Design a protein with these regions (language model features):
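Short glycine/threonine-rich beta-strand-turn micro-motifs
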Residues: 5-41
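Surface-exposed, low-hydrophobicity interaction/linker segments
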Residues: 1-2
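Generic structural motif
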Residues: 18, 29, 56, 91-93, ...
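Terminal interaction modules at protein C-ends
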Residues: 62-286
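Short acidic/polar capping segments at secondary-structure boundaries
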Residues: 20, 29-31, 56-58, 104-107
């Protein structure tokens, strides 16, 4: 019967073992009659099958490039090393879905993707040097947008949902933010200043402006965490925990002082990123 799926608009086929009856769902009543006639002509007794009209065909489960997941290099359809982290999902002005990560992840690569899929050639990505961010459009293999950080291999069994994003003028001084990255996994820091400028070592001298400066201790961000989500955990009492997106990780500087060692992390603001890339942040529950 598998060769006739399209001919008879078959949605599903199953067996009720108790009654030894084959259950078939098709999309239209006309196809139901045609299939019934076909089965009877092949010698099947009418009591041996049950045909149901179901106009809705099952749809494949969506594949997501989730915030906090690893960004990989791809060459000729072969996955390479993981070099950065997804910050958030977005949609561009042409209606194309994709994810945002650090612009400097593009410097020496030709294709970027996730574990399962090569998403885009770098030439198809939209980049903003002044916010160290880039939009990587999805290929046809990824079918859904998501605001859910859900990677048990990196962040344990806790899931987080990006439900909103901060405005560029939000006063976050003194606020504790949580970062997600493929190397350090999860780290926290306190915002020291809400508008700083800096240039990336090894870059082209472009000045990144109006970024958050965050002081981290204990576990600190490291290589590969670039582009990753930085957010305020809004409600840890619910599942998934809700969070407000502040920006993505761009760079770090290590300091040693008499009071101890610490790291400053620099976080371009989400609103500046979406404006520069002309994309819309997606926060949702998938």
């Amino acid at each position: 019967m598998s060769n006739n799926n399209d001919k008879y608009a078959i949605n599903t086929v199953g067996i009720t073992q108790k009654d030894n009856v084959v259950n078939v769902s098709v999309s239209t009543s006309e196809k139901a009659e045609e299939l019934s006639d076909e089965l009877i002509s092949k010698g099947f007794e009418k009591k041996s099958f049950d045909i149901i009209v179901d106009e809705m065909r099952p749809t494949p489960a969506a594949t997501y490039a989730r915030p906090g997941d690893r960004v990989y290099t791809w060459t000729g359809g072969t996955r390479g090393s993981h070099i950065a982290t997804i910050g958030f999902n977005a949609k561009n002005s042409s209606g194309k879905n994709g994810f945002v990560t650090a612009e400097h992840a593009l410097w020496y690569e030709k294709n970027l993707g996730i574990y399962e899929y090569d998403c885009s050639s770098v030439s198809n990505c939209t980049a903003s040097k002044s916010t160290d961010s880039c939009f990587v459009p999805f290929n046809s293999g990824i079918t859904g947008l998501t605001g859910l950080i859900n990677n048990s291999g990196l962040y344990g069994n806790t899931t987080y949902k990006l439900t909103a994003s901060y405005n560029a003028s939000a006063d976050l001084e003194g606020v504790t933010l949580t970062g997600f990255g493929k190397t350090s996994k999860k780290y926290t820091g306190v915002v020291l200043r809400t508008s700083v400028s800096y240039s990336l070592t090894g870059g082209d001298g472009t000045l990144i402006t109006d970024a958050l400066e965050m002081k981290t201790a204990y576990k600190k961000p490291a290589g590969g965490d670039s582009g990753g989500t930085v957010a305020k955990i809004k409600d840890a009492s619910v599942t998934p925990q809700t969070a407000i997106l502040a920006g993505i990780l761009s760079a770090t500087s290590d300091y040693t002082s008499t009071s101890g060692n610490y790291t400053l992390a620099y976080v371009p603001k989400v609103k500046n990123i979406t404006t520069a890339l002309n994309v819309t942040f997606y926060g949702g529950s998938n």
